[in-house]
């Protein structure tokens, strides 16, 4: 609570550590729709958000849980699932008439090859225009699950499953 004029109460979402308003302002001033990528422990969530004066509007929403409908049998929170979710997002966004956006990873740490960048790479590979540097994106072996299949023989068919799911997602674009 403010006691005198020298005390400044921060916005609630800033106090909770949920929003970086400086970053949000720079993204909104760009004038482009935001491709918002969020990760949980079990899923990847991608949304296309348009900022308006009366609030933000969700234009396209994709959750990695939807990959099961395309035949994906792997874990829904790993790098291949993030890549496939990004592809599914790009297909749905293009069908809705949106060609591009600007990446918004929020307060997540931007480390090379992270799941959020796998999702962005999936969207870029499916034809969605997102300005991103190639150096921070994960390589193709991580996106198709080769590192997981190499680690444990129980996941030997993961690479083929990722490729089959990728083909099923791209068929939705047609």
UniProtKB/Swiss-Prot annotation:
Record GO biological process: ribosomal large subunit assembly; translation
Keyword Ribonucleoprotein (UniProt): yes
InterPro entries referenced in this protein's UniProt entry, alphabetically: Rbsml_uL18_euk (IPR005485)
Superkingdom of the organism of origin: Archaea
Keywords: Ribonucleoprotein, Ribosomal protein, RNA-binding, rRNA-binding
GO molecular function terms noted in the UniProt entry: 5S rRNA binding; structural constituent of ribosome
Keyword Acetylation: no
Disulfide bonds: none
One term under GO cellular component: cytosolic large ribosomal subunit
Summary of subunit composition and partner proteins: Part of the 50S ribosomal subunit. Contacts the 5S and 23S rRNAs.
Family membership: Belongs to the universal ribosomal protein uL18 family.
Protein function: This is one of the proteins that bind and probably mediate the attachment of the 5S RNA into the large ribosomal subunit, where it forms part of the central protuberance.
Protein name: Large ribosomal subunit protein uL18
Phylogenetic lineage: Archaea, Methanobacteriati, Methanobacteriota, Stenosarchaea group, Methanomicrobia
Originating gene: rpl18
């Amino acid at each position: 609570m403010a006691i005198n004029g020298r005390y400044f109460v921060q916005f609630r979402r800033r106090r909770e550590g949920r929003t970086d308003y400086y970053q949000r302002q720079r993204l909104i001033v760009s004038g482009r729709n935001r491709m918002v990528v969020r990760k949980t422990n079990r899923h990847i969530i991608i949304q296309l958000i348009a900022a308006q004066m009366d609030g933000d509007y969700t234009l396209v929403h994709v959750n990695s849980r939807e990959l099961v409908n395309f035949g994906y049998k792997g874990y829904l929170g790993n790098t291949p699932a993030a890549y496939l979710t990004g592809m599914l997002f790009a297909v749905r966004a293009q069908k809705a008439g949106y060609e591009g956006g600007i990446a918004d990873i929020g307060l997540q740490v931007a480390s090379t090859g992270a799941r959020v960048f796998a999702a962005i790479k999936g969207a870029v590979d499916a034809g969605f225009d997102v300005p991103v540097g190639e150096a921070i994106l994960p390589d193709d072996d991580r996106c198709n699950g080769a590192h997981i299949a190499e680690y444990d023989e129980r996941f030997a068919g993961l690479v083929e499953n990722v490729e089959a799911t990728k083909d099923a997602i791209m068929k939705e674009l047609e």
